[in-house]
Structures are given as C-alpha cells and as structure tokens.
C-alpha cells in the first residue's frame, strides 16, 4: 500500500482567521488512518481550532483540508456536511433531563449492562449513573461524553482536552479503551492536551503547536508516521 493510500487527512497551507487574528497557519500535515495522534501545545496555541477543522465543525479561511482524499462536502449554503463516521467528543446532543443510566439504556439498549460494568465501576464514576445530565460536574460530563464516543464505533474519534478533568482511574480506563478501539477496530484517534505526559504514554505520533504553527512532530510509542511542514 502506498503512503498516500494510508492517509485519512491531508492539510495544505491551512489558515484560520478570527477577527483579523490568525489562529492557525499550517503548511502541511498528513494524518494516517488507524493511528493515535496527540496534539500538544499551551493554552491558545490553536489545538481546539485544529481539531474542530478536522471534525468538519469549522471551515478554514484559506488552504486545503482533505478527508479521505476529498474536501468535505457542503450544502448549497456552504455549510460542511460532517461525515457520520467522525465523532467529536461532546458534540452530540442528548436530553439533559435524563439520567446518565437512562441515556445509556436508550442509546445502547443491547449492551447497557456491559457499559455500566466497564466504565462505571470506580468509586467516583459509579456515582454518575443516577444523576441527570444537567446536574453533572464538568468532569463527570467529560467522562459521560467519552463513554458515548468509545461505544459508538466511529472511524475517527476526536477529543479536545483529553483527561484534563479525569481522576487517575478514569484516565487509565480511557487510555486502555482508546488503545483497544484503535487496535481492534482500526479507529483513528486524535486527542489534544496541554499535558505532554498525558498523551506521550500511548500516542503513536505527537504534534506540537505553538501560536497556531506546528513546531515539531515526534514519535510516541510507535514509529513516527505523520508528515508536516511549517509555514
């Protein structure tokens, strides 16, 4: 298989401008399918903006972003048609009046018991089940959102601020399940964090951002596969 055939994303001269301020400016970045990527950088470095572009939630000001060798399809009004196989954690609407357990049983009726045993057995996480979504703390909501993503079997899973609000048990389970998903299903996983240690443990490729530019790409646990250039 040639190198281009393994690409799932390709970015060229990608720029995003908000109110005359350039937030990201990426000369070139290639993301390969079936790989776990970590996007690292300080607050304000452009991580969230980059992830939202990869998810099809925002349009670039300039440049090219290809998913599966094609730019995203658009409606006649110019809005991006987000592919259903791309899952951006936290972007899927569910009724805030329902409890966590009710949502799980509603969305995944055939495997709700397994989900509860797998993700809500810890001393902290098990307290989440009877709570309504509108009463969840930011950390509890982040865990619930990730659980929905892990069980949705997406082709691409994207999460901003990975593990920022998790305790040690939650972070361990999250890493374990993301690695399982990647290994068993071939899911491309793209995570961001300000914490180098959180992603270095299990990402195959680490992409470092600063002031909207890629400053370096380094291999994590496996051989480096991402290619980039600054501009």
Give the location of each predicted region.
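A short, flexible loop at the N-terminus of ABC-type nucleotide-binding domains that lies
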Residues: 2-27, 76
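The feature captures the beta-strand-to-loop junction immediately N-terminal to the Walker
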Residues: 40-42
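Conserved ABC transporter NBD signature motif
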Residues: 63-74, 80-82
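Q-loop/switch helix immediately C-terminal to the Walker
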Residues: 92, 97-111
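Catalytic Walker B motif of ABC-type/P-loop ATPase nucleotide-binding domains
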Residues: 157-161
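H-loop/switch region of ABC-family ATPase nucleotide-binding domains
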Residues: 192-194
């Amino acid at each position: 298989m040639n190198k281009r055939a393994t690409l799932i994303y390709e970015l060229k001269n990608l720029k995003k401008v908000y109110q005359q301020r350039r937030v990201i400016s990426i000369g070139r970045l290639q993301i390969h399918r079936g790989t776990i990527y970590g996007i690292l950088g300080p607050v304000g470095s452009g991580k969230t903006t980059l992830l939202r572009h990869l998810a099809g939630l925002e349009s670039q000001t300039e440049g090219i972003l290809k998913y599966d060798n094609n730019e995203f399809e658009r409606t006649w009004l110019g809005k991006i048609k987000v592919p259903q196989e791309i899952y951006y954690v936290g972007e899927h609407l569910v009724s805030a009046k329902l409890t966590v357990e009710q949502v799980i049983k509603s969305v995944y009726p055939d495997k709700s018991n397994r989900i509860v045993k797998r993700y809500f057995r810890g001393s902290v996480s098990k307290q989440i089940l009877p709570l309504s979504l509108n009463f969840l703390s930011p950390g509890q909501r982040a865990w619930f959102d990730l659980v929905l993503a892990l069980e949705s079997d997406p082709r691409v899973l994207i999460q901003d601020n990975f593990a920022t609000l998790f305790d040690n048990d939650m972070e361990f389970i999250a890493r374990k399940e993301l690695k399982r998903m990647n290994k068993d299903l071939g899911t491309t996983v793209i995570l961001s964090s300000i914490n180098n240690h959180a992603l270095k443990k299990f990402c195959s490729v680490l992409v470092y951002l600063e002031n909207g530019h890629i400053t370096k790409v380094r291999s994590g646990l496996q051989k480096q596969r991402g290619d980039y250039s600054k501009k």
